[in-house]
């Protein structure tokens, strides 16, 4: 039986640029492991960053900019949208009401440096 989500992997063109975007501009916790791979931590889950030039054979069809995911925040999404715009991040949509895994959420959508669609949502 499937019990939850452990991690996702993003194939990226420039790991340093991606780490800077998520860590410095969005506040994600970032760390490098012993193999030199970067991880973004989100509570009990994580996002692994994999340079597209060094993808393992099992992930050879993974392309930068094709992911679409939602992370949760406790921050007011109207304030978040304003903060993103002030940081030079183009807000594509939102705040807008959606249905999340556990109920109503208010979401803000934007792209990361590789073009992945990032949704940050706050439960209503």
Model-derived segments and spans:
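Vicinal oxygen chelate
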Residues: 82-124
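N-terminal beta-strand motif that seeds the catalytic metal site of vicinal oxygen chelate
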Residues: 1-17, 67-69, 123-124
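Short, charge-rich, low-complexity interaction segments located
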Residues: 54-60
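Short beta-strand micro-motifs in enzyme catalytic cores
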Residues: 38, 67, 104-108
């Amino acid at each position: 039986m499937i019990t939850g989500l452990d991690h996702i992997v993003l194939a990226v063109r420039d790991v340093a640029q991606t780490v800077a975007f998520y860590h410095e501009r969005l506040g994600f916790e970032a760390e490098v492991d012993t193999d030199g791979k970067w991880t973004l931590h989100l509570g009990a889950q994580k996002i692994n960053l994999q340079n597209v030039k060094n993808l393992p054979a099992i992930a050879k069809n993974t392309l930068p900019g094709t992911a679409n995911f939602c992370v949760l925040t406790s921050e007011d999404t109207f304030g978040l949208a304003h903060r993103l715009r002030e940081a030079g991040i183009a807000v594509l949509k939102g705040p807008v009401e959606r249905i999340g895994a556990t109920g109503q959420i208010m979401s803000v959508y934007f792209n990361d440096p590789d073009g992945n669609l990032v949704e940050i949502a706050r439960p209503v």
